[in-house]
């Protein structure tokens, strides 16, 4: 599943394609959304917001399209009039004079009014987004030590979108390697230096992944700036200590770690 950096880059691509341009055609696959098609013709996208792995497309008439790609959803940008050859099922089409954005295969799609943005179940539950520039290590540290999260093992906590939105499996293993901790650690057991390092890594690594513009299915992000240190590198030597990276399963997801320097 794409993680926060990949979702934010998708939002950037959608904004670059149609932001501020009048919509000339709108189509929704789901019957409950059909009534909004005519309401959006002539309107424009004001901005595209991410909340972890959810995407909010805001329109000039104050409506907001909520979509969560889950495992299979994908957005594509095409020239208007182009019909991509794909076996995926089209769910949403937002067309302007020159560019069209298409959402395929997603099933979690809703249209929200302003007052619903604060009451939507997912948006209520999701924690602060790691890519939000206003989120600071101090706030992250407070969340780590809060009664709700301080007793949780990091293996599960770092996948919980209620803790911090936008984290996922590759970020989980890279963050824990960076700070030399395992998935079994808990915030309550860390000393001040460990806690500070973790709070910074929880923001720095996702932001580095996003800023250096890479692809999750390559072994690097945006050129050679971000490299996986442990993710999908089981059997290889750790670049920090030389021990062999191992793979196990934690919280039902593959977990990669170095037994030599994560303890």
Curated annotation (Swiss-Prot):
The reaction(s) this protein catalyses: 2'-deoxyribonucleotide-(2'-deoxyribose 5'-phosphate)-2'-deoxyribonucleotide-DNA = a 3'-end 2'-deoxyribonucleotide-(2,3-dehydro-2,3-deoxyribose 5'-phosphate)-DNA + a 5'-end 5'-phospho-2'-deoxyribonucleoside-DNA + H(+)
Gene Ontology terms for molecular function: class I DNA-(apurinic or apyrimidinic site) endonuclease activity; damaged DNA binding; oxidized pyrimidine nucleobase lesion DNA N-glycosylase activity; zinc ion binding
Superkingdom in the source lineage: Bacteria
Residues where DNA binds: 70, 125, 169
Zinc fingers (FPG-type), renumbered ranges: 229-263
SUPFAM superfamilies: Glucocorticoid receptor-like (DNA-binding domain) (SSF57716), N-terminal domain of MutM-like DNA repair proteins (SSF81624), S13-like H2TH domain (SSF46946)
Cofactor or coenzyme needed: Zn(2+)
Family annotation (InterPro entries): DNA_glyclase/AP_lyase_DNA-bd (IPR015886), DNA_glyclase_Znf_dom_DNA_BS (IPR015887), EcNei-like_N (IPR044091), Endonuclease-VIII (IPR023713), FPG_cat (IPR012319), MutM-like_N-ter (IPR035937), Ribosomal_uS13-like_H2TH (IPR010979), Znf_DNA_glyclase/AP_lyase (IPR000214)
Co-factor: note: Binds 1 zinc ion per subunit.
GO biological process, one term: base-excision repair
Gene3D superfamilies, per the entry: 1.10.8.50, MutM-like, N-terminal (3.20.190.10)
EC number: 3.2.2.-, 4.2.99.18
Active site (catalytic residues): 2-3, 53, 253
Swiss-Prot/TrEMBL keywords: DNA damage, DNA repair, DNA-binding, Glycosidase, Hydrolase, Lyase, Metal-binding, Multifunctional enzyme, Zinc, Zinc-finger
Classification via Pfam families: Fapy_DNA_glyco, H2TH, zf-FPG_IleRS
Recorded family membership: Belongs to the FPG family.
Role noted for this protein: Involved in base excision repair of DNA damaged by oxidation or by mutagenic agents. Acts as a DNA glycosylase that recognizes and removes damaged bases. Has a preference for oxidized pyrimidines, such as thymine glycol, 5,6-dihydrouracil and 5,6-dihydrothymine. Has AP (apurinic/apyrimidinic) lyase activity and introduces nicks in the DNA strand. Cleaves the DNA backbone by beta-delta elimination to generate a single-strand break at the site of the removed base with both 3'- and 5'-phosphates.
Record-linked PANTHER family: ENDONUCLEASE 8 (PTHR42697:SF1)
Name this polypeptide is given: Endonuclease 8
Organism of origin: Shigella sonnei (strain Ss046)
Gene name linked to the record: nei
